[in-house]
Amino acid sequence: MGTAATIQTPTKLMNKENAEMILEKIVDHIVMYISDESSDSENNPEYIDFRNRYEDYRSLIIKSDHEFVKLCKNHAEKSSPETQQMIIKHIYEQYLIPVSEVLLKPIMSMGDIITYNGCKDNEWMLEQLSTLNFNNLRTWNSCSIGNVTRLFYTFFSYLMKDKLNI
């Protein structure tokens, strides 16, 4: 078993004061996006299979998941690498794997390969994450949300590639 990947907290992305607020805003916007998209998919067999497996989309984005919020706060408080791993694993199991089925698979492109390769340079990837502008979330469209989701997904994919069967 290899050593655990360590995430260093980008100050702009998360700090003690805004971690929960950022999480809440992102969750709200992704829930709205997914809810809008799902209305067109009611008769789609893949959507029905997905819904049967994961239930309602909104249950995937665990807005009231206190453990998830607590883990994010712990991360923001520069918690141990072990806790950081718990965060990554929790994001994977409860959020990114299911959402990737909806948001990522239909829009995969060469850009994903470039992003994934960028993940090999953790400092570069953290810089990308730390420069996200959360002040204009109201203006984010589905493309923006999808791109941010993909950014997080590919980053966590790289960090966890030896830890999870993906």
Swiss-Prot record:
Subcellular location: Host cytoplasm
Covalently attached lipid (N-myristoyl glycine), positions: G2
Induction text: Expressed in the intermediate phase of the viral replicative cycle.
One GO location term (cellular component): host cell cytoplasm
Keywords of the record: Host cytoplasm, Lipoprotein, Myristate
Mod. after translation: Myristoylated.
InterPro entries: E7R_orthopoxvir
Family label: Belongs to the orthopoxvirus OPG069 family.
Protein name: Protein OPG069
